[in-house]
Every structure is written in C-alpha cells, then in structure tokens.
Amino acid sequence: MELASKYNPADVEGKWYQYWLDHKLFSSKPDGREPYTIVIPPPNVTGVLHMGHMLNNTIQDILVRRARMEGKNACWVPGTDHASIATEAKVVNKLAAQGIKKTDLSRDEFLKHAWAWTDEHGGIILKQLRKLGASCDWDRTAFTMDEKRSESVLKVFVDLYNKGLIYRGVRMVNWDPKALTALSDEEVIYKEEHGKLFYLRYKIEGEDGYAVVATTRPETIMGDTAMCINPNDPKNQHLKGKKVIVPLVGRVIPVIEDDYVDIEFGTGCLKVTPAHDVNDYMLGEKYNLPSIDIFNDNGTISEAAGMYIGMDRFDVRKQIEKDLEAAGLLEKTEAYTNKVGYSERTNVVIEPKLSMQWFLKMEHLAQIALEPVMKDDIKFYPAKYKNTYRHWMENIKDWCISRQLWWGHRIPAYFLPEGGYVVAVTDEEALKLAREKTGNPNLKMTDLRQDEDCLDTWFSSWLWPISLFDGINNPGNEEINYYYPTSDLVTGPDIIFFWVARMIMAGYEYEGKMPFKNVYFTGIVRDKLGRKMSKSLGNSPDPLELIEKYGADGVRMGMMLSAPAGNDILFDDALCEQGRNFCNKIWNAFRLVKGWENGMGTIDIPADAHLAVQWFDQRLDAAAVEVADLFSKYRLSEALMLIYKLFWDEFSSWLLEIVKPAYGQPVNGFIYSMTLSAFERLLAMLHPFMPFITEELWQQLREREPGASLMVQPLGEPGEVNEEFLQQFETAKEIISSVRTIRLQKNIALKEPLELQVVGANPVEKMNPVIRKMCNLSAIEVVDAKADGASSFMIGTTEFAVPLGNMIDVDAEIARMEAELKHKEGFLQGVLKKLSNEKFVNNAPAAVIEMERKKQADAESIIQSLKESIASLKNV
C-alpha cells in the first residue's frame, strides 16, 4: 500500500481509536501482572473539554501507555463528578428559560429534570477525551452519583457519624446568596478590593459625646449587639463600663473589653455583629451577646433588621451612607483596600452567616494523613507542594459537609416526630433505629422526615480511589486488593486540599494505606503572554478545533513541549504546529526508508552504513535508559524532547544520510533491516506521546497479526552501551560538521572531493569510512604537519586540516580572515577591559566572571588559529 505524500490525521485517528476499542486494548482485569492504576480526576458533568483537561489527560495517557508497554496491567478508570452547585445552577437556569421556578417544583420533580440534564450533557467531556486518544477503560466509567458510589457515600457518612466524627450544629458558615447554600472555607476565594472605610458615630448613652467606629460594612449596624475596646487602649479608657446607641437603629448596646481588638485599626473601637462576622461570633459566644440575623438567604435584608427590609445588601450600603450623613452620624470615609471572600462557584460575595449545618471533625483525619506525605511514602512532584500540604493540614478546621441543594447525595439523617434524629443508610434501617430510640413500635416511615440538605460534592470524590473498586461496599474484594493503592494521581495544585488531602485521609481511614503512591501536579495553562486562559479574555482555544487543525498527536506534542513538571504552561499554537511538522517529518522518513524496499540487492555491507547502524542501535539503548530515568522523575517534557532530538537530529540527519544508497543504487538487505528495526524502536519510544501516527506506521512496517498493536508491544530491556564507540562516532560527527563548515565558508561544492589531514595520530581511524562518505573525501592522511594554505580545526587535542590548493582565491581569503581577526581582537579587548575592572570582579557573581573568562579563552584561541591560518596562506 502506497503512503500518502503528507500525513493526514483525519485518515488515521478515528480508525485506530476504534481498532483499540474493538480489540479491548484499554480493558483491564486483575491477573498475575504488576498493576498500574490511575483514576481520572472526575470532570464535572457540566463541563466541556478545556486546555486544563487537555494537559491533565495527555499526561495521564502518556503514563498509562508507557506502563502498558512496560508489561504492566494498566488500568485507567474514567468518570464524572455530579458537581452539586454547578449542575443545580445549570438546571435552574434551563427551567427559568422555560418559565419554571425551582420553588414551584417538588424535590422529586426537580431531580427528574436534573437527571435528564445529566443524561443529555454528562457524557460529553468523556466523548471529547477520546478525540485526544485517551486510553481509558471505558467499560469502567463511573459517576459520583451512580448506585455504587452513592451507597459508598451514605455508608461512610453513617460510619463517621457513629464514630462521633460527624456532628450537627449552629455555626458561622460561608453563605452563598446566589446558590443559597453553605460553602466550606476552601470554596471561598479572596480577592483584593478597593472600597471605603466608614467612620460611624455611636452616641454615648447619657452623655453628649460619641464613640466612633471604623467599618467596611455599615449595612450590618442593624445586627450590632455590642461595642468592643481593648482594655489596654489609653485613648478609649473613658468608654469602659459605658453603653452606646447604634446610629439610625437607636438600640442601646454595652461596651465590652477584649484584647482581641487591634488598637491601631481605625479608632480602636469595634462594632460587634455576632450573626455576620466570624470573629464577632466568637466574641458573642465569649460574652454571651445576643445574635440578630439581618440577612435573608438571598442577601436581602430580613424583617429582623427592622429597616431597609427586602433591599439588597449592597443597595443598603449605598443608602445607609446617605442616611447616616443626613443624620450627622457619618464622621468621614476613607479609601480602603481589603480582601473580600467570593464564592468559587458563583463568583458572588459570600456572607458569613449563622446556620444549622453538618460538620466533619478533621483533626483525627488530618493527623493520619500528614505524616505519609512528609515522610515521602506518598511522593509529590514537584516536592515544593509538600509545604502547601503541611500548612493546610496543620491549620485545618472542621469541614462543613452539608449543602442547601437538592442535586447531590441527600444526607441520611431522619428527624423524629418528638425531636432528635437517627442516621442510617436506608429508610428501613432508619425506621428500625427510630422505633428503638423512641420506644414506639408503631412509628411509620411517613412519621420521619429526612434532612432536606445534600452533601458537599467533595464528600463523594474524596472516596474516588476506593469507591471505583467498590472498596466501601465490599471491603477486601478482588479488585480493591489488586488495583489499590493506585499508582499515580495527576491533578492541579489548586485542589490539593479539596481533593488530594481528603483522598489521603479517606485512604488511611478506610483502607489503612495510601490511595496513590505519587502525585504529579500540573501547572496552570497560560497563553504565550503569561495570562491565565479564560473565556472572558478570549485567549483559550477550543481543544477540539486544535485537534482538527493540527491532529491529536500534534496537539499532544505541543502541550507537552510547553509543560515542565509542576510549572505553569505558556501555551502557543505554534507548538502544535511544531508537533504537526514533526508528524510530517516522521511520515516522510518512513516513506524514504520504505522506498528502499524495492531496491534491495545482494551487495556487500558498506562499511560506513555498518558503522552507522551499529552506532544508532547503541544510541537507542543509551536513550532508552535516559528516557526511563526521566519518566521515573516525571520529567515527561524532557523525555519527549530527548526522543524528538534523537529522531530529528540523529536518525534523520545522520543515520539516514549515511545509510542512504546513492541514486539508482541498491541498498544492502542487512542495512535495510537494521534501519527498519531502529525506526520501529523509535516509534515505540514515541508511542505514549504520539499514539496515532506511531500506530499507523508500526502497522505499515511489516505484516502484523490480527489484533496486534504497538500500544501493547513490550519496550524490552536496552542492551549494553559501548561508551568509547559512541564517543568516537560523536567525534566523527564533529569532524564531518567542521569539514562541511569549511566547504560553506570557502564556497566549495560537495561534489568536489577534498583531502583530510590528521596531524599526529588519528583518534577515530575506525570511523574513517563514515567521515570519507559524509565529507566526500578522496583521502584521509596522517601527517606530522599540515600543508601550507590548509584550513584547519581542532577536535579535542587533535588538529585536522583540509588542504585547499587552488580551490580558493588566496588573497580574498586572507582579506576575509584579517577582517575577522580585527573583529575578534576588538572583542577580546572589551572582555579584558571588563576583567581588569576591580569593581566588576569584586561585585559580579562568580558565574558571570567565569563566563567572561571563558569568552577570553575562546577569543584568544580563535585569534591564534586565525593568525596561523593567515601566515599559512601567505606561504602559498
């Protein structure tokens, strides 16, 4: 079959992906081989493929494909996350477009809409990953709300509750007024904002004077129940034991004392609003202050405030400023910059709010999860993230796990008619416990009321490495014993606490061991200007359009060339173009080599070609060792670059040029076979990075058995490397490059044969056949002294010379070299001037001084060589 002149990914990618699926090459079942397991960070069902997914899943696929070729039983488990807040928001918006409000529906009616939306959209991103070449075991596709995962979540909730680690209580939480739910601390993003500091006058009861308070939130004065001063603050001693009147509101509140108050902030007087500030809440608890909740769940003012009822909180801030000023109770305002908490999900300002919620105690779980990372039982790549992890774990707070949403795992708590509640996985178990607790055998299920809230989405995904193998429902089953702990986790550092830390906690709590052995943290994908990719900036390309334009292999290569481990990626379409060009280079090299097949003859093995195939075979062995080492350190970008250079610079530019038969001449069968074998080994090394083109060409190389695939071919062990032989060949390459440079400088055509003189002894005599062919030499001669007028160069300590005879215009060459000599002498003077400057030598870094000294040595060497060459030419 004749290959097309140009590689067309569209002809190849769909064909081979379907072939891999048809032959179950992604599938995995427990057997006697060493397992290699990766669980996909489950993308949200609301999601479509973006550049972050592309990077993360390209890396996972590279690791999985490499493991298969190492003979491991590779299992990459895909799945999606139900994403409570994001999905519920999508469904609410869809219903709103149809004129339906969530509040008009029952829970069951709403969930029918949510499931329908999920069924329609939930699999989109996984289908898109196939375009990338992701070799997931699709038969194992899971969903965080499927039956097994849901049962696992409920069992863990009940277990942790029974262990005393889950409790219910009124606490200050982060409230999202748009999503109408509590958030964990980790779901709050703090942004720096330029606002105002308002100085408010609180009249001292029974006196004419005022106490002035500085606040960023004047709209919360309706919830003030105290003023607090620092007992050590000399400027506010006169307020001790007094009472003040809340401006506009008229409420009389006490002045309390606590050294928590910062004397330097504002006036040193603090308004205390226990229902709407975390620190004020703690003061309220300490001094038994009343708590007035002035906000409705949607961020409007509640009836409890007594004024501005129903207005939005930010509208009230504007209005209350005017009202305070009109009443003479606003002393002044100042520009002020502070950090404001935003909901990660809805991007609205969160509201600290007292709320009845469910919490998970974290101290015990954090203790068991910290040491394995700090001791490198679980390795982080890059290791710098260990410090981030430790900081989180040592400053951990209890996890608010309840959400005021319907889409998600409903909390398995059931309230009793007379108060109190029971916790159980099923209705039947709950009823049994309720009858026992109340002593009433006649209780019916309809007498119980299940908690309306659902669990934080992360409460299901923290069990992911265990629940995927059904380890919660069926402890010790064959799959959990075989696949767990998993091998590598590839994820972003932004969810190191949300997900990575919590999976480690769950792993040790429920399996008694780590959930994964290594964590590879990817960087953030940025554009070439260093900006984070986002829809609003319009700088985030559509991954599917990139694949259509450059091919999946081209895009994968572009991503990986710009992806140093753990550092941010500066992505540029030009890198995908480079990847596509590399595909064409591979394609054309294959066409060239296969084109020799019809011209094979029974000629003797050419000495130059024999040396070349021996050399490249050893280069492949050496490269295989280097690539394995880079994979072990997760330096995948460097591994790809090494293979790229091996193919482009050494296979194409050297091996093929040496073994290529002259036009119209046959190729030796042994040389052809060795070249094909080298090509096949290169395809195997490249396959994890570029699976489609490598599979296509591997199948074309020779006849294959039905169902055979490069992706399951063993890489094999590299052979012994003769370092001396490799070094001699490298020296030969340097000689060839130097002779070619002389031809270029002297404008001597390659068809004109030259002689090469070796002064003293030839250190690479064994390589003469290669040097002779690649330089078109009539002779290689060992001499005591080079010929007059010869152009020379040094390789190591050996001098080589090319006698030029009548091939050049001597006068013109002398003039050219004298001009170069003048330039180099001027350059040297500049370097020497810098090195003679004591200030420079005493203050510059050692590396900079060393670089200048190297410039001096190099310039002096070139000047000496030029002077000798000029003198030699003048003797001609």
Swiss-Prot record:
It comes from Bacteroides fragilis (strain ATCC 25285 / DSM 2151 / CCUG 4856 / JCM 11019 / LMG 10263 / NCTC 9343 / Onslow / VPI 2553 / EN-2). GO terms for molecular function: aminoacyl-tRNA deacylase activity; ATP binding; valine-tRNA ligase activity. Transmembrane segments: none annotated. ValRS has two distinct active sites: one for aminoacylation and one for editing. The misactivated threonine is translocated from the active site to the editing site. The C-terminal coiled-coil domain is crucial for aminoacylation activity. ATP binds at K535. One of its GO terms (biological process) is valyl-tRNA aminoacylation. NCBIfam families: PRK05729.1 (NF004349), valS (TIGR00422). It holds the Pfam family Val_tRNA-synt_C. This is Valine--tRNA ligase. It comes from the Bacteria. One of its GO terms (cellular component) is cytosol. A motif ('HIGH' region) lies at residues 43-53. InterPro entries: aa-tRNA-synth_I_CS, aa-tRNA-synth_Ia, Anticodon_Ia_Val, M/V/L/I-tRNA-synth_anticd-bd, Rossmann-like_a/b/a_fold, tRNA-bd_arm, tRNAsynth_Ia_anticodon-bd, Val-tRNA_synth_C_sf. Catalyzes the attachment of valine to tRNA(Val). As ValRS can inadvertently accommodate and process structurally similar amino acids such as threonine, to avoid such errors, it has a 'posttransfer' editing activity that hydrolyzes mischarged Thr-tRNA(Val) in a tRNA-dependent manner. The keyword Lipoprotein does not apply. Its EC number is 6.1.1.9.
